[in-house]
Amino acid sequence: MLLSRNLRALAAIHLWIVYLLLEDLLGTCAEGDNQRLVASAPYQDIEITLEKPRVQAVAEPHTLRYDLMALSLEVPGLPQFLTLRYFDDEPFLPYKKNSSITDSQEPRIKDHLRAETWGRETDDLQEEEEQLKGMLAEITAQNGQNTDLHILQATFGCELQRNGSTRGFWKLGYDGQNFLTFDQKTLTWTVDGPSTQKNKTFWKTRAPRADLVKTFLDDICPAQLQRYLASLRNGLLNTGFPKVIVTFRNYPVGRITLTCRAFRLYTRVATLTWLQYRKPVQQKTFGSETILPSGDGTYQAWVSIRVLPGQESQFSCNLKHGNHNINEPAATEAPVYGARREQPPTSGVGSRVGKSLWSAMTTALVVISWTLSQKLMGPLLWFCSGGFCSFLQCW
């Protein structure tokens, strides 16, 4: 039984690591309110020196999220502690227990934060590690699970909404299952799922103090989010001007498909408009749920229209993005009909490796699941939600 439990926990860890890799490199989809597990930050008394951000309306919501994971035992090839931070679902500042290096995957953020601010962020990760490890040790000792492999996960953060207000979220998970959620309105912890009163009391007494969590969600996290947002605004010149490209190809029924692609978008809001004789005929506005990440911290979007052969010169594409207003003609030379024009390669790391990476990572996921389930535990059904994965064994 001990071996079986360890193997099951190890399988859950491998799947969770694969999930993180997919999310980091391919981007994530928008989920419902606070569906991710996050953990740690101020488990102990701290002195608050940050001013509460001034309420100010924004064009689009922004999110700062922390994902943490701690293992009760050392597993070869896996970090015993892992932290990932996300700004608007873009990963940056990974931290692993077995590595003394903490580096940003989003250089625009690091380059424009003061050195002392960046150092404080790194120090916080080490404190969070100790707090999460201590909580995990206490839980396993209380339940007599010291010799088994167990996982404690946490997810917390805050969202800056369009009206300038903020809301926070904080969840804890154990062995792939949600077990504690913080209610920001009542300032209490709730135990997820059915549980005895004794278990509820046990979990609640091990949770971070409500007053410290409130301070983090109401003050510290929004202030950090505002700093990251300001650093991106100050670093917009690093992205260069947005780039607009128009391509065309023959359509089988006597039409030409014009495609307008916009690259190097530094926020998740943009509007693309097709103009005929400088008058709008088709317009699409992209937001956080429809714009595409390029994989390098910028975004991209595209829109197509079908026209009659010979009309290409009548059309142009207009991009409105921040302070930029760019017009690109649909045709600068006579098109060659009868042959499909090759589309230019999409810029950005994510687009260059997206298909091959998705194939490789999907294969890895299948191999891991199949190998572990068939050779070690029998058929399994996997369920993943908000970064937490659980499984049912099929007999």
UniProtKB/Swiss-Prot annotation:
Coiled-coil annotated residue ranges, if any: none
Pro-piece positions: 370-395
Q: Which SUPFAM superfamilies match?
A: Immunoglobulin (SSF48726), MHC antigen-recognition domain (SSF54452)
Q: Which residues are glycosylated?
A: N98, N163, N199
In this record, residues modified by a lipid of the kind GPI-anchor amidated serine are S369
Q: Which UniProt keywords apply?
A: Cell membrane, Disulfide bond, Glycoprotein, GPI-anchor, Lipoprotein, Membrane, Signal
Does this entry carry the keyword Membrane?
A: yes
Alphabetized Pfam families for the sequence: C1-set, MHC_I
Stretches for region Connecting peptide: 338-368
The protein's location, in the record's own words, is: Cell membrane
The UniProt annotation puts the region (Alpha-2) at 149-240
Keyword Calcium listed? The answer is: no
**Region (Alpha-3), start-end ranges:** 241-337
Locate the region Disordered: 332-352
Describe the family membership recorded for this protein in Swiss-Prot or TrEMBL.
Belongs to the MHC class I family.
Instruction: Indicate the quaternary assembly.
Output: Heterodimer with B2M.
Q: What is this protein called?
A: MHC class I-like protein MILL1
- This chain's source organism reads Mus musculus
